[in-house]
């Protein structure tokens, strides 16, 4: 085996609340724990919030998701440190740019061996996604997929050569095969039949269909209780607050199932998670998207020896084959109820399914997965040492979504200096705001466009105050009598004698149009459309 002096993982990382963050953290620790490893194992973490996260010392470099320059710096960091191999965690929504294309700029600049783990593989990608994937396959020395379905799609849809592909399953904790009753008293549910779904909450999870199935389940099994474990996904919470969870809670009350559905709205650590999984009699993944090539929650549940009821998304079809679980059609509450009732009523069959699932997943425990990755890294390093990636090779993989120009990070300090609680001042003396010139409607409309675009790129909540200020100015600028926007306001907040004109009016409408498209909150959009 070729010795690897350092291994770098690129992706999001714990304590960020995301399935891939958990995966990246787990694979780093699993590899570092292998007895033959004396390598320097570290991570390059991707941040989706401006202030980042309180990472462990394992994280040596941070990339701001929307800042292209950070990707170039990350490549330089990896090159300068002469890492033995880079393992990239890829999902389209993880990186900035069109369909996550910012990561390509880093990879084209990278001069180290690259293994890419694909957490999403689409059979019908958009044009942008297809372009990103094709460049990713060229720039990577090997591609890892977490299921046979992913390998088949890469071969058939993207034309990737078989020898470039490796299947390494999603890692899982190595847990004992235990009776669910062992953990139930800890959660106050002893003597009950426990159904469980865990993971970060979002509308694609399909949990509403299990809730709709609960009355039928309870009619046959009055002691059944359904636990929904997990906080709302941070991105969902930023964009729509707790709308999905609140809708689920309303459905529970409308069905009178308050005594049979428990919400645990929190992100639990691994030890507590495994105790929750341990107490489940039936684990349910009612996901709505068929094109899901991997599910970490499904792997965890099966690896703990759970009887699973799932919708037939790709990973579930593969994992639950050979009677290792039960499938129910998408969006079908009656079918879910039938499958759950069957398992709860047939203890012998339920335990047989549990055992088949548990035995099948022994190859997926983290120590084994870590060994699989180390063997792959060794093979890649050995092959790469004879033909290292040149700068020209990286440039040859360039496509239409990114170019090689490094743009500076957008700096809003001067815009903020020119903005007071009324709006954006028209002019300045050198860099100092000139109050004698007052405020212009057209300028505030343009500022609304800039701040809206900046928020979309960075999700920096500090920009929201600017958006509110410019939107408020435009609302005040509208003259109902003429049906036009007034063009100028003096510094004393009185409108100038200049009559409304069509130029200011058209630019204001342009700004409000962008406001409707880019404003993050419904209240802002509602005001912009008035």
Question: What does each model-found stretch correspond to?
Answer:
Residues 9, 189-205, 211-214, 227:
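Conserved donor-binding/catalytic core segment of Leloir-type glycosyltransferases
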Residues 149, 171, 232:
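Carbohydrate-associated surface elements
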Residues 177-189, 194:
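A short helix/loop element that forms part of the nucleotide-sugar donor recognition site in Leloir-type
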Residues 239-267, 271, 422:
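Nucleotide-activated donor-binding/catalytic signature segment of Leloir-type glycosyltransferases, i.e.
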Residues 302-303, 307-310:
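Short hydrophobic beta-strand element within catalytic cores of glycosyltransferases
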Residues 322, 326-333, 342-347:
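Conserved acidic donor-binding segment of nucleotide-sugar-dependent glycosyltransferases
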Residues 342, 349-363:
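A short, well-ordered alpha-helix in the C-terminal region of glycosyltransferases
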Residues 390-443, 457-489:
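Low-complexity, Ser/Thr/Pro/Gly-enriched N-terminal "stalk/linker" regions
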């Amino acid at each position: 085996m070729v010795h690897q002096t350092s291994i770098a993982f690129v992706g999001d990382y714990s304590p960020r609340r995301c399935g891939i963050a958990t995966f990246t953290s787990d694979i780093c620790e699993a590899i570092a724990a292998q007895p033959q490893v004396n390598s320097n194992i570290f991570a390059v973490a991707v941040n989706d919030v401006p202030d980042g996260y309180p990472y462990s010392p394992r994280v040596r470099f941070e990339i701001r998701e929307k800042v292209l320059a950070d990707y170039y710096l990350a490549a330089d960091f990896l090159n300068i440190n002469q890492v033995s191999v880079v393992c990239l965690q890829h999902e389209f929504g993880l990186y900035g740019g069109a369909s996550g294309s910012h990561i390509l700029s880093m990879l084209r600049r990278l001069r180290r061996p690259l293994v890419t783990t694909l957490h999403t593989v689409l059979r019908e990608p958009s044009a942008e996604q297809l372009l990103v994937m094709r460049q990713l396959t060229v720039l990577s020395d090997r591609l890892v997929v977490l299921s046979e379905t992913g390998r088949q799609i890469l071969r058939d849809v993207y034309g990737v050569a078989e020898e470039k592909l490796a299947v390494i399953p999603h890692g899982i904790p190595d847990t004992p095969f235990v009776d669910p009753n062992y953990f139930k008293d800890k959660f106050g549910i002893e003597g009950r039949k426990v159904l469980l779904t865990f993971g970060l909450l979002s509308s694609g999870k399909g949990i509403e269909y299990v809730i709709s199935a609960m009355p039928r389940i309870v009619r046959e099994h009055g002691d059944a209780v359904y636990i929904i474990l997990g906080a709302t996904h941070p991105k969902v919470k930023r964009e729509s607050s707790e709308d999905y969870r609140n809708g689920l809670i309303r459905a529970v009350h409308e069905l009178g199932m308050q005594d049979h559905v428990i919400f645990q709205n929190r992100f639990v650590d691994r030890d507590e998670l495994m105790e929750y999984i341990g107490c489940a009699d039936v684990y349910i993944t009612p996901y709505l998207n068929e094109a899901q090539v991997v599910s970490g929650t499904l792997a965890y549940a099966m690896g703990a020896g759970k009887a699973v009821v799932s919708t037939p998304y790709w990973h579930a079809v593969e994992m639950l084959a050979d009677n290792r679980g039960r499938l129910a059609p998408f969006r079908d509450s009656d079918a879910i109820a039938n499958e759950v009732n069957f398992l709860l009523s047939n203890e012998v069959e339920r335990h047989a399914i549990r055992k088949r699932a548990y035995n099948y997943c022994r190859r997926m425990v983290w120590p084994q997965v870590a060994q699989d990755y180390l063997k792959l890294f060794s093979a890649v390093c050995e092959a790469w040492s004879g033909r290292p990636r040149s700068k020209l090779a990286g440039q040859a993989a360039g496509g239409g979504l990114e170019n090689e120009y490094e743009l500076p990070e957008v700096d809003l300090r001067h815009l903020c200096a020119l903005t007071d609680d009324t709006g954006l001042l028209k002019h300045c003396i050198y860099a100092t705001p000139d109050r004698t010139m007052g405020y212009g409607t057209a300028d505030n409309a343009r500022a609304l466009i800039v701040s809206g675009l900046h928020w979309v790129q960075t999700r920096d909540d500090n920009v929201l105050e600017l958006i509110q200020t410019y939107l408020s100015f435009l609302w005040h600028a509208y003259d109902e009598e003429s049906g036009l926007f007034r063009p100028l306001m003096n510094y004393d907040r009185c409108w100038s004698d200049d009559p409304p004109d069509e130029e200011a009016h058209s630019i204001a409408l342009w700004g409000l149009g962008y406001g409707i498209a880019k404003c993050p909150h419904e209240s802002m959009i509602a005001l912009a459309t008035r």
